């Protein structure tokens, strides 16, 4: 976000007051993003760039003054730009907010953060008692919201990240068996299977409702001959040398710290020699500079908003150590925005 700063020297008292309000503004912009998505504002402006507030209100059936205030506020935070008397999406936000078929569509993400923000009502009590409320106890509606918000993550991986990981890409092209740990609603399972027709995919998750969502998605996509989803934890696999690739998307940081060594060991056992383990996750910043800089500081924020779930976001160094302790060797690495991507190989 933007904030006024003193031209030279340390920030003034007024600067810091403005900074506080700028931080609070993020709460309200999160709600604006979701309200605009629900109303269809972003998609309407992708269809008709240059539409003025009154015309947009007519198309959406909304109040013209309310619609104009929404657009002006979105403009003030860089989401919209002027086009003559009307509005258009700012650079790249047409893909990010206005095109559900885009690989980079993230318009559902604000909704998830609004839902998980409800946990904050209990934070003071958790702080005082040292208690947790695990992710899996948040109910079916929350699981649906998460599945919807994360369904583009595998597309981002396949379209933008995988080309930077030639070893893993070659293995997937060859085909074989793939295990997705923490499959959630099944989007990684089906999208990887659709992209690589010689690959069969198995998804596992400890949350039963998410597994049912994944099973339904597999059936809807006509992939039941190559894809499965099971309610199972990774340490219940009981399979040795069974998979060419194991994937995990935003899952490793959600495994309880006491269970992580066993989970990594189970993955190592399940991989065939020469197989790959993909960790697409957050990595907690290891320096003050990265702790204070976007996008890396978002991992610290993830540790904060998932704090009472019992999650611990590992640093990159800690992830490497976990791989080594399980007998895996880091083979490839890259990053995308807030995400750290590691590929470890089984010798």
Identify the meaning behind each predicted range:
Residues 261-273:
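A short glycine-rich, Lys/Arg-flanked "PGG" loop and its adjoining helix->strand segment in the class I
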Residues 189, 194-235:
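Class I SAM-dependent methyltransferase SAM/SAH-binding core
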